[in-house]
Amino acid sequence: MATVTDINQSQTSRVAKVKPSSTDFMEVGSTGLNQTAGIVNDDFLRQLQGKQAYANYREMADNDPVVGAMLHAIEMIVRSVDWSVEPSNRDDPRAIEEAQFISTCINDMSTSWDDTLASILTFLVYGFSYHEIVYKYRNGYTDDAATRSKYNDGRVGWRKLPIRAQDTVQRWDMDDNGGIRGMYQMDPHAPDKGLVYLPIEKCLLFRTTTKMNNPQGRSILRNAFVPWYYKRRIQEIEAIGIERDLAGMPVAYVPPQLLSNNASADERAALSAIKQIVRNIKRDEQEGIVFPLAYDPDTKLPAYDLKLLSTGGRRQFDTNQIVTRYDQRITMTVLADFLLLGHEGIGTQALSVSKIELFLTSLNAYLSNISETFNSYAIPRLMRLNGVSEELSPALTYSPPKNIDLEGVAKFITSLAQAGAPLFPDQDLENYLRGMAGLPQGQAEEV
């Protein structure tokens, strides 16, 4: 009776097959990305559009100590991560063999894996990084760099994944729906090569975000630009103020005739020279001024004079607090404000741990981005070049970075032991705890 009911239900729930329309299998709209002829101008700040954006982001990364510390911390953590290649099916010998093959390809490139990761990580600064895939035949230790390999199996492997610098991007090749077909590169240091086209099938594109399929992603420093911009100018004003406080503010006294509208050409030239002297006064090992000595015939006072006015007392604003505030804003934009804990005399251990864990969580997303790009594009393409089914494509994986609180783990285990939990002897648990602490694995006792 139940069987009849199930059959009747399946028959009544079946609907007539609808014929798809002509537009169901085609893309009608577009992403809406603000781009013209492949030139992306999606940011509303003019300073962060085109080549000027690359220059500003590079200045932030190379000149600002706080931004540099954030990026250095990210790179060092990524370099310390353990990467591995997992087979698509652990029970299939062919899948295991292909996983081993990809692992050898990663370690057989002319550029080390760590250095390759370092160049990939520039996508954090600029929003994207574009890498050309250069293949090679693995023909052992030959004199030809195009075929030199640690392995002599004749298979196609990766020779290198060189970056194509972000500031050499001339424009993108995009279809009518916003899909990315490739990139046109113009290297200013190799103008003879002209405009070079790099199709997306031959490259890997790493991005912080795929919003609106923007090929340039979004720099992690984007939200830090405004506080960095004001911080840099406040530091410049601060340096000028310090110099003026130490050297004094120069004041030049000149005859009124030099400042009048009917001053002669010689008088205007003299005034211009005196202004230049005032602007260039600095305290250094070559300090000194040559100034005319002349007296007013009526007052018998010097017609020309130069004085340095010193300022007394404190300024109305504490620039140190202002710069510190902007430093905090900069680190907060990438969840790295734990770097400043202790510098301001505030912060607790618990707060530090929670902030570091939040930072590592965000970093884990970037690592996932890198591995997904390899798993979706680089590895399947290499499989096809070697005539291997993509079903056997292995996956590039990594061990997520963790902030292990060994003291907290020790207290937790102690509490379990005091509660009567049977923890030891347990060789697996012991080895796991040893691994957390970076200690060598223990030897199981023979029975």
Question: Each predicted region: which residue ranges?
Answer:
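Short His-Asn-centered micro-motif
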Residues: 252-253, 291-293, 333, 342-343
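Cation-handling catalytic/transport regions enriched in His/Asp/Glu
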Residues: 91, 95, 307
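C-terminal anchoring/interaction modules
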Residues: 1-28, 269-308, 388-447
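Ordered, soluble secondary-structure elements with a strong preference for glycine-centered loop motifs
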Residues: 264-268, 313-321
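An acidic- and aromatic-residue-enriched active-site/binding cleft used to recognize and process polar
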Residues: 90, 136-138, 294, 311, ...
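Short acidic (Asp/Glu) and glycine-rich catalytic loops that position anionic groups and cofactors
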Residues: 76-81, 244-255, 300-311, 338-339, ...
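C-terminal helix-loop subdomains that flank or include functional centers
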Residues: 317-447
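Structured, contiguous alpha/beta core segments that scaffold functional sites
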Residues: 2-68, 72, 76, 88, ...
